[in-house]
Design a protein with these regions (language model features):
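Non-heme iron-sulfur electron-transfer modules
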Residues: 511, 516-517, 548-583, 604-629, ...
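N-terminal glycine-rich flavin-associated loop
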Residues: 30-62, 84-126, 138, 142-194, ...
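N-terminal flexible segment immediately upstream of the FAD-binding catalytic core
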Residues: 1-57, 67-98, 127, 175, ...
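Ferredoxin-like iron-sulfur electron-transfer modules
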Residues: 482, 517-537, 569-593
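Iron-sulfur cluster-binding electron-transfer modules in prokaryotic oxidoreductases
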Residues: 500, 608-941
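C-terminal substrate-binding/cap subdomain adjacent to the FAD-binding core in PCMH-type
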Residues: 137-139, 147-150, 157-371, 523
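Iron-sulfur cluster-binding cysteine motifs and their immediate structural context
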Residues: 503-510, 540-564, 590-617, 794, ...
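Terminal amphipathic helices with adjacent charged low-complexity linkers/tails
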Residues: 253, 288-385, 420, 424-425, ...
């Protein structure tokens, strides 16, 4: 099978049967788990068509996977999994943002980032927009909090390029699309026309379809296409929407975009009981509220446990209460004020349990949204170890929402599902709830089965749909016939047969006559590590992970550990060892431990913490002792590193490279850094100027600048002012005195030891550094300013466990960028601005919230400041980019293309090693932003 698939692809390595690749790709965000036989990565639509023809000939099924954020099991398989994310990320904005052409691997957030500059966005607004991709948005007919059924995928998709299982490619935007379809697929063309006639001629079918699709509904195929469109090509395109990869492959889609609101006002409205909240919905919907989110009493109780919960919830004695999170949005302040006043007037007439007001303050609004979005994380993160989270999604007519939620709560009580919060999009009658259980226990699986039967009866009895926006998948496929009836279910079966007569696309998904299908292949999540056990495999971490296109993502690092543990529990030691053999490079060596995964994770997992511990466990006593010795003599060690770069620059490059490669082969690529000629010379010792006045801060120049000298635009030669000289010059120019510790050469934040798992040396160096900083800061009175963002973060982490001595203040660590933006910039001469600047925020500056200050400094330097749309962590990660340059090359590839297209006057960041990584990736010299500020404020310069 693997050979037959390889034969139709153009590059080696596009088909993998390796155990690590198969198990890493097995899990998506759903509660199902199937391990594919192979993972295939095609490069374009033509290869996908060839794959489908080859799979049909072999009788092998295919399942497409892009973002892997689907929740109903529609993107898992035990056959061939086709990755249509990696090579399908193109985005083309059309008509100044009125339309956009997108391929399936681009995320909604990436598309909206490009549309934002035109004041537009996509209509579908799924909560998973940071990670979900256009492929899934189309395949699931995604909607979201705001779009309802008027701006969802079905309503806003203008055209698509669809690859059928036969290999036929149909661009529905082509004037002769129907002619092409009729010529190449005559049976399909006639069959679609006949099915449209069949449904239209049956008044009962028409009534059922119209009722079903008058609300959010992703159960089964979108039969409304048979009523809404007249030509087979358009019918086919709109049947493909929501078809979950069972009819063909959507290689490209063109969307009509919608206006992007720029002003919002938000309030949390609390009611005495659920029915009162339900009764308020019509008035709120009529008032043109953009969002109305429901939180039931259990949600409010769980929300009270969240950090930062607003007083309106925190101080509430919850009984039968419910709340609606209401938001108005507009494109102008005047429009918003009109909506806000109408909303304020409504609050006095809809029976609130306590007064409420709408706020436009960004921080206050963020607190309210944190409550809503934190509920899922709170319940999922607190679930018992070894249990699986299952998120359900239903819709009923809005008038039935209150009694449906009440009945659901009674079902939770009957089946003893505790903390099962009900929340969702109230104005659409669409709610979500989560169950957590150990479904490997037969009794608990039976409980879930019984609960599901009662839930299905409840929802269908209220005239609702069993899936509003998450797709049918495997979880509701056995119930499609019950929701639609035999006649329309038969129509769906014929649609599948017409498009995919060989049944090669995603069998078992969307239509399944096995009444137990939803109870099979439920994911087991054995406990593997405290740092990551609460992971729900949502995939939100993947777009921000720098190793995502090279080896593994954080989700894949975790699910592979679970696969190893499951194999051992099942007695399959051979599989466990096979996975472990490949795990070290893929999961440990090529992890940047940048913590960006935590910024995207709804349960705040930093997979880097796990990797650091694994590195620590792998480190032998000799290595620990060696790194501890370096910590004890760090002043000498850091200077020697810089001198080594000076020496390398003087020697013939070929000789240096040859010797370096030989040592790497002997000692290992994860031990000896790779030398390359574009590296700068050494940076020299950290200076300590004599103080001339009363210092306002302690200045901690990072040791990385002692190892790596500054960039010299155009030449790479020494002599430019590095970041330490620049900070001191800026402070002097602003009339601000800084104190540099007397023993600065021996001090370090400890990050190199922490990231490598060298805990003994880390303890040695951080103890010395904290003692020196406490001494020179007058026991915490003065702030400490560091000039490299990763080192700033390292110092903050080191201080997390420090207990200040009695009577002393905690040490305050500031980054030089934020210190400059607040204290120096207002006192400096007006900078001479350059035309343009491309800025690279770092993972550390992002995690610490420093990017607004970074942008402020950059905007003082340049007329035009741009951050590439595909910005991300460069993965240089201290020395990781020297040990594994392939990691940085992969992480920066798309960003580098955009940097080169921008071709700015200058390029800047706020961390020396990140500057090295971006210089290597782009060919442009990157400097610290404060070096550029220094140059632009030199008198007469």
């Amino acid at each position: 099978m693997l050979r037959s698939l390889e034969d139709v692809l153009t590059k080696p390595g596009q088909v993998s049967g390796r155990a690590l690749d198969r198990h890493a790709a097995a899990a998506d965000a759903s509660h199902f788990l199937l391990v594919p036989e192979a993972v295939v990565t095609p490069t374009d639509a033509a290869e996908v068509g060839a794959l489908m023809r080859a799979s049909a000939a072999q009788g092998v099924s295919l399942t497409f996977r892009s973002g892997g954020t689907s929740l109903s099991g529609q993107a898992v398989t035990d056959s061939v999994l086709v990755d249509v994310r990696k090579n399908f990320r193109d985005i083309e904005v059309l008509d100044e943002g009125a339309r956009v052409r997108v391929r399936p691997g681009a995320t909604v957030r990436q598309v909206n980032a490009r549309l934002a500059r035109h004041g537009r966005r996509l209509g579908p607004d799924p909560a998973s927009e940071a990670a979900c991709t256009i492929g899934g948005v189309v395949a699931n007919n995604s909607s979201g909090m705001n779009c309802g059924i008027t701006e969802n995928t079905y309503q806003t998709l203008e055209s698509m390029t669809l690859v059928l299982p036969s290999g036929t490619v149909i661009d529905t935007a082509a004037p002769d699309a129907d002619g092409i379809l009729r010529h190449h697929e005559p049976h399909l063309y006639r069959g679609l026309a006949q099915l449209a006639d069949r449904v239209r001629s049956d008044s009962a079918s028409v009534a059922t379809v119209r009722r079903q699709f008058s609300m959010k509904n992703t159960m089964g195929y979108g039969l409304n296409a048979l009523l809404d469109f007249d030509t087979p090509a358009q019918i086919l395109a709109h049947l493909a929407i929501g078809s979950e990869g069972t009819l063909g492959f959507v290689a490209e889609a063109v969307f009509r975009t919608v206006v992007r609101p720029t002003h919002s006002a938000t309030a949390l409205l609390v009611f005495e009981e659920l029915q009162a909240a339900n009764e308020a919905l019509p008035a709120l919907v009529d008032s043109r509220a953009a969002t109305v989110e429901l939180l039931d009493a259990t949600s409010l109780r769980v929300g009270q446990r969240l950090t930062g919960t607003p007083p309106i919830v925190r101080d509430l004695r919850v009984q039968d209460h419910a709340a609606l999170l209401v938001e108005y949005s507009a494109t102008t302040a005047e429009q918003l004020e009109e909506l806000r006043q109408h909303g304020e007037a409504l609050t006095g007439r809809i029976g609130l349990s306590q007064p409420a007001g709408f706020t436009t303050d960004a921080d206050a609004r963020a607190v309210l949204w944190h409550l809503r979005k934190g509920l899922y994380a709170s319940v999922a993160g607190a679930r018992p170890q070894g249990t699986t989270a299952l998120l359900e999604d239903i819709v009923v007519p809005v008038p039935a929402l209150g009694r449906t939620c009440t009945a659901l709560t009674q079902l939770f009580d009957r089946y003893d599902y505790r903390d099962s919060v009900i929340l969702g999009h109230a104005k659409d009658g669409n709610v979500h709830f989560m169950l957590t259980d150990d479904f490997a226990d037969p009794a608990r699986l039976q409980r879930y089965s019984d609960f599901t039967e009662d839930m299905v009866d409840l929802v269908l009895g209220e005239g609702g749909s069993l899936k509003a926006e998450h797709g049918t998948g495997r979880v509701m496929a056995p119930y499609v016939r019950r929701q639609y009836g035999d006649e329309l279910y038969g129509v769906m079966r014929e649609i599948k047969q017409l498009c995919d007569p060989g049944g090669v696309l995603n069998p078992g998904v969307l239509l399944n006559d096995d009444p137990q299908a939803h109870l099979r292949h439920i994911k087991a999540e054995p406990s593997v590590a405290e740092e990551v056990d609460r992971c729900v495999s949502c995939g939100y971490c993947e777009p921000v992970c720098p190793s995502r296109d090279l080896t593994l993502t954080p989700r894949q690092r975790i699910v592979t550990l679970r696969a190893i543990r499951s194999a051992r529990l099942a007695g399959d030691e051979a599989l466990a060892q096979s996975l472990e053999e490949d795990y070290d490079y893929a999961a440990v060596q090529t992890c940047a431990v940048d913590g960006m995964c935590q910024t995207a994770c709804p349960v705040e997992i930093n997979t880097g913490d796990l990797v650091k511990r694994l590195r620590r466990q792998e480190t032998g006593a000799v290595a620990q002792a060696g790194w501890n010795l370096a910590a004890q003599h760090w002043g000498t060690a850091s200077i020697v590193a810089g001198r080594a770069l000076d020496l390398a620059a003087k020697l013939p490059a070929a000789a240096t490279i040859t010797a370096n490669q030989l040592v790497r082969r002997i000692a290992g690529a994860d031990t000896v850094p790779l030398y390359s000629p574009e590296l700068p010379r050494g940076g020299g010792r950290r200076r300590r100027p004599a103080p001339v006045g009363e210092p306002v801060a302690v200045y901690f120049p990072a040791c990385v600048s002692a190892m790596f000298g500054p960039a010299q635009p155009g030449t790479g030669a020494p002599g430019a002012a590095g970041v330490q000289d620049s900070v001191l010059a800026l402070a002097q120019r602003a009339g601000v005195e800084l104190l540099v510790p007397s023993d600065i050469d021996a001090l370090c934040c400890g990050t190199p030891w922490s990231s490598k798992g060298k805990h003994t040396g880390q303890e040695t160096i951080t103890a010395r550094t904290i003692a020196a900083l406490r001494r020179d800061s007058d026991h915490g009175r003065l702030p400490i300013v560091c000039d490299a963002s990763s080192c700033t973060e390292g110092l903050r982490h080191a201080l997390e466990v420090e207990v200040p001595p009695a009577g002393q203040q905690p040490l305050r660590i500031l980054d030089a960028v934020e210190f400059t933006a607040e204290h120096l910039l207002p006192r400096l001469p007006e900078p001479r601005r350059i035309p343009s600047l491309t800025l690279h925020p770092t993972c550390s500056s992002t995690r610490m919230g420093l990017n607004p200050a970074l942008a402020r400094v950059a905007e003082a330097i340049a007329e035009d400041v741009q951050i590439p749309d595909d910005w991300g962590c460069c993965a240089f990660a201290g020395d990781r980019g020297l040990l594994h340059p392939e990691l940085t090359a992969s992480a920066t590839a798309r960003q580098a293309e955009q940097v080169q297209a921008i071709d700015a006057s200058a390029h800047a960041s706020c961390n020396r090693t990140c500057e090295l990584g971006m210089s290597r990736a782009t060919g442009y010299p990157y400097s610290h932003v404060l070096e550029l500020l220094n140059q632009s404020t030199i008198a007469g310069g």
